[in-house]
């Protein structure tokens, strides 16, 4: 019975907090960080993701993708991330980035908020350090420029190795960073997963 109560509380918390932003221009960066923390505390792993999956950069070679109840529901109804054409307003997807010692080094988030930015499918983009300090928030051009590669999936990439960035595209976005050799191996092993 206790497990059922906890599950109901988790679902209500995720739905209520996400729903609160579903029909607005979006929360403050600090309020969004609180939403991210809920997903972190509940280990709300996105369908298709796994803990400490390969990341593309050597500075953060491991990642974990999280999603709130609305995003997970959208993914499941579509039959997988690759089949999603539009996420529900209030959907929140998060990428945690970890260093080689599996310590959290950064967090990025995308929140779907109606009326926020129709030209970019109403996604609020955000980047935080591990403590929640805001590094970027809003209509972040560099984020949007990369995510537009998967516009047909409503700007959300599937976790690797389901989808991988081409090396040339990766280098254009991360020109001052080193590519994770294990990620390059995945590109060679799964050429069909490289975004075109």
Predicted feature locations:
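Cleavable N-terminal signal peptides
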Residues: 9-10, 20
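Bacterial N-terminal signal peptides that target proteins for export
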Residues: 1-8
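Sequence context surrounding c-type heme c attachment/ligation sites in exported
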Residues: 23-32, 36, 80-196
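N-terminal secretory signal peptides
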Residues: 23-86
């Amino acid at each position: 019975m206790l497990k059922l109560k906890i599950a109901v509380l988790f679902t209500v918390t995720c739905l209520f907090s996400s729903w609160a932003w579903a029909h607005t221009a979006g929360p403050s960066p600090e309020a969004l960080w609180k939403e991210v923390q809920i997903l972190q505390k509940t280990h709300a792993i996105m369908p298709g993701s796994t803990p400490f999956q390969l990341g593309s950069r050597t500075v953060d070679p491991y990642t974990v993708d999280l999603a709130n109840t609305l995003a997970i529901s959208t993914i499941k109804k579509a039959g997988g991330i690759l089949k999603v054409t539009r996420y529900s307003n209030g959907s929140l997807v998060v990428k945690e980035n970890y260093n080689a010692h599996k310590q959290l080094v950064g967090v990025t988030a995308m929140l779907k908020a109606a009326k926020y930015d129709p030209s970019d499918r109403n996604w609020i983009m955000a980047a935080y350090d591990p403590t929640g300090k805001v590094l970027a928030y809003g209509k972040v051009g560099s984020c949007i420029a990369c995510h537009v590669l998967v516009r047909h999936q409503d700007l959300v990439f599937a976790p690797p190795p389901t989808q991988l960035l081409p090396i040339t595209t990766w280098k254009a976005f991360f020109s001052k960073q080193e590519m994770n050799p294990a990620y390059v191996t995945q590109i060679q092993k799964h050429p069909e997963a490289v975004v075109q």
